[in-house]
Amino acid sequence: MAKKNRLNTTQRKTLRQKEDEYIENLKTKIDEYDPKITKAKFFKDLPISDPTLKGLRESSFIKLTEIQADSIPVSLQGHDVLAAAKTGSGKTLAFLVPVIEKLYREKWTEFDGLGALIISPTRELAMQIYEVLTKIGSHTSFSAGLVIGGKDVKFELERISRINILIGTPGRILQHLDQAVGLNTSNLQMLVLDEADRCLDMGFKKTLDAIVSTLSPSRQTLLFSATQSQSVADLARLSLTDYKTVGTHDVMDGSVNKEASTPETLQQFYIEVPLADKLDILFSFIKSHLKCKMIVFLSSSKQVHFVYETFRKMQPGISLMHLHGRQKQRARTETLDKFNRAQQVCLFATDVVARGIDFPAVDWVVQVDCPEDVDTYIHRVGRCARYGKKGKSLIMLTPQEQEAFLKRLNARKIEPGKLNIKQSKKKSIKPQLQSLLFKDPELKYLGQKAFISYVRSIYVQKDKQVFKFDELPTEEFAYSLGLPGAPKIKMKGMKTIEQAKERKNAPRQLAFLSKANEDGEVIEDKSKQPRTKYDKMFERKNQTILSEHYLNITKAQAQEDEDDDFISVKRKDHEINEAELPALTLPTSRRAQKKALSKKASLASKGNASKLIFDDEGEAHPVYELEDEEEFHKRGDAEVQKTEFLTKESAVMADIDNIDKQVAKEKKQEKKRKRLEAMRREMEAAMEEEISGDEEEGKTVAYLGTGNLSDDMSDGDMSDSEGHLKKKARTVDYSHGHNPSNSVDDDIIEVEEPQTLEDLESLTAKLIQG
């Protein structure tokens, strides 16, 4: 085997100097690069390092897309970026390349901790980003980690302290920030939010705020999505004030022009379908497109499960798959891999795969249920027609949804064409569904759950002009699922759909008057008021009635007394002592005594307490005094005073809030420091135990010295097994003059190693005698 050449100190120093010069030249090129003057078309035209270029070239990334050419130079120069682009335009590379280049220019190592944090709203998108990063960063020395739900937390905790680039979902990242001792974000260089509008919405608001509060404020932030948010409040939460807006959308007057939200190669269609006929149309569509690769979006995981199981039993003639958020992570990953490899397949899915996932060669995207807004529509149809390829989309709209939702699409310059259904191609599957649900109780249960989940999804939608809950044909929809009737649904504060409609249409005043008595007064329900232990004590009943067991005992004693005397004296006559009269006022029982000593009862008898404060002159004043009206008006208008007071108090509360955040951050850091200290002590204790164990083992074995220090030291390097098991004849060389330098011709005594005390004594005697 060839010997590996090691560089000496001079060579290593020269290599470091060359690397420093290369990085400085790279920084100079980045500062001098102006994307307005020279717009790059290829990755090699950008000022990026050779290892990154090599990884891109090996992964077949040669030509830049529009979003990459616009955003990468700005990100390389260190600006915060708010980027919006079409779906399938290469946004992942647009933020991964700046992340790698930033850490490369900073000479980042595993000892520097976490350098970049990439947050994704879904597990599948996080996995896709991680795979792309490992491909293009294969020639760099950075460590990357993926943390998502469904994986082993302990396995991630053991390794997360050595990660340079961390990719994950918000919930799992926050969990590691709270629990991982070695995860330090104080030196973070870059924060990236993929599908930023989804990460910033109400679903992830608290989680994302908690993550951002632990990060360094000097970081660089990149936000990427196909539908971008420019809300000032959202951007302020991320400390994003001086940022650059780039992308394919033209920014005019602070608003994004959404003219090119969907790819130009995408053909968009819609059909008007009654709710009860949706499954018939879907099954007919699948039967007529057996040679295609399609994704069918439904609103809930229960619907996905029901449609998949029923269609699978009816065998439409194409491979069927299903994917939703309630599946295990392994099943979701396997389904994605199978769908990517297949060419003729139908995938039933929820919005868990609506964003960012790169599915190859998808022909059709079918939306059975209307999306909650236009942004969701854009992300759904973006699963096809990616990277300039052709694709088609179809959305099914009920007559109640059609007019309002098409207006919202037209407002975003999206105009889908209308398709008419051929009656010859339409096939009713209602009898088959009824037969399947009658034979299989599990399918019937799934159908009921699918019905309930769809109705609830309509009920909770915000856009009431599109989603009209009162006009839902529930009986017809239940019949179309194969159910005998509409199941009863419990809403928040409403037992059934009928009660919900009745309560919605009922007059409010009539409902208020129904609680009034004959005099027209509304009686409050005292049963809902809290009851104290004193209330419960005085509400006790039948306290004078004794138990049956006690009555039986007293009855037997009374019979014994009657047998002795006919008349018995209970008490002799006596005189009342006036000195004993005050004792009659004392409590007669412990309960009465406890009540007399109760602070609550005594305070109730005294009335409400009044707190006073004293001024400098010693006069008492109530804590809250009403100001004179004339003095109040002297200070100005009431609305102006109100605004000034709110502004002043808001500033005070903001300062207190910042202090509270700093205290919470310091407590969290102190908690981590204590964990690290405890781990260090455990490691030191383990090392001390090992050392003490080795010393004790060394004391149990005694060696006979040779008089030569070097020989003794070499003998001490033996392993424990050699010292205990090997029993060789030991040669002891002692000269007459006790000089080790004498010749070897002097007297030599060969003896075996002593085994017992007698052997040792005989050997000592021989040595003394010479």
From Swiss-Prot:
<feature type="binding site">
    <location>
        <begin position="85"/>
        <end position="92"/>
    </location>
    <ligand>
        <name>ATP</name>
    </ligand>
</feature>
<dbReference type="InterPro" id="IPR014001">
    <property type="entry name" value="Helicase_ATP-bd"/>
</dbReference>
<dbReference type="GO" id="GO:0003724">
    <property type="term" value="F:RNA helicase activity"/>
</dbReference>
<feature type="modified residue" description="Phosphoserine">
    <location>
        <position position="714"/>
    </location>
</feature>
<keyword id="KW-0539">Nucleus</keyword>
<dbReference type="InterPro" id="IPR011545">
    <property type="entry name" value="DEAD/DEAH_box_helicase_dom"/>
</dbReference>
<dbReference type="Pfam" id="PF00270">
    <property type="entry name" value="DEAD"/>
</dbReference>
<dbReference type="GO" id="GO:0006364">
    <property type="term" value="P:rRNA processing"/>
</dbReference>
<keyword id="KW-0347">Helicase</keyword>
<keyword id="KW-0067">ATP-binding</keyword>
<comment type="function">
    <text>ATP-dependent RNA helicase required for ribosome biogenesis. Involved in the release of U14 snoRNA in pre-ribosomal complexes. Required for pre-rRNA cleavage at site A2.</text>
</comment>
<dbReference type="GO" id="GO:0003723">
    <property type="term" value="F:RNA binding"/>
</dbReference>
<feature type="modified residue" description="Phosphoserine">
    <location>
        <position position="743"/>
    </location>
</feature>
<keyword id="KW-0547">Nucleotide-binding</keyword>
<dbReference type="InterPro" id="IPR027417">
    <property type="entry name" value="P-loop_NTPase"/>
</dbReference>
<dbReference type="GO" id="GO:0005524">
    <property type="term" value="F:ATP binding"/>
</dbReference>
<keyword id="KW-0690">Ribosome biogenesis</keyword>
<dbReference type="InterPro" id="IPR001650">
    <property type="entry name" value="Helicase_C-like"/>
</dbReference>
<feature type="region of interest" description="Disordered">
    <location>
        <begin position="705"/>
        <end position="747"/>
    </location>
</feature>
<keyword id="KW-0597">Phosphoprotein</keyword>
<feature type="domain" description="Helicase C-terminal">
    <location>
        <begin position="278"/>
        <end position="437"/>
    </location>
</feature>
<dbReference type="InterPro" id="IPR025313">
    <property type="entry name" value="SPB4-like_CTE"/>
</dbReference>
<feature type="short sequence motif" description="Q motif">
    <location>
        <begin position="41"/>
        <end position="69"/>
    </location>
</feature>
<keyword id="KW-0698">rRNA processing</keyword>
<keyword id="KW-0378">Hydrolase</keyword>
<dbReference type="InterPro" id="IPR000629">
    <property type="entry name" value="RNA-helicase_DEAD-box_CS"/>
</dbReference>
<dbReference type="Pfam" id="PF00271">
    <property type="entry name" value="Helicase_C"/>
</dbReference>
<keyword id="KW-0694">RNA-binding</keyword>
<feature type="short sequence motif" description="DEAD box">
    <location>
        <begin position="194"/>
        <end position="197"/>
    </location>
</feature>
<dbReference type="GO" id="GO:0016887">
    <property type="term" value="F:ATP hydrolysis activity"/>
</dbReference>
<protein>
    <recommendedName>
        <fullName>ATP-dependent RNA helicase DBP4</fullName>
        <ecNumber>3.6.4.13</ecNumber>
    </recommendedName>
</protein>
<feature type="modified residue" description="Phosphoserine">
    <location>
        <position position="710"/>
    </location>
</feature>
<feature type="domain" description="Helicase ATP-binding">
    <location>
        <begin position="72"/>
        <end position="246"/>
    </location>
</feature>
<comment type="similarity">
    <text>Belongs to the DEAD box helicase family. DDX10/DBP4 subfamily.</text>
</comment>
<dbReference type="GO" id="GO:0005730">
    <property type="term" value="C:nucleolus"/>
</dbReference>
<dbReference type="Pfam" id="PF13959">
    <property type="entry name" value="CTE_SPB4"/>
</dbReference>
<feature type="modified residue" description="Phosphoserine">
    <location>
        <position position="692"/>
    </location>
</feature>
<dbReference type="InterPro" id="IPR014014">
    <property type="entry name" value="RNA_helicase_DEAD_Q_motif"/>
</dbReference>
<comment type="subunit">
    <text>Interacts with the U3 and U14 snoRNAs. Associates with pre-ribosomal complexes.</text>
</comment>
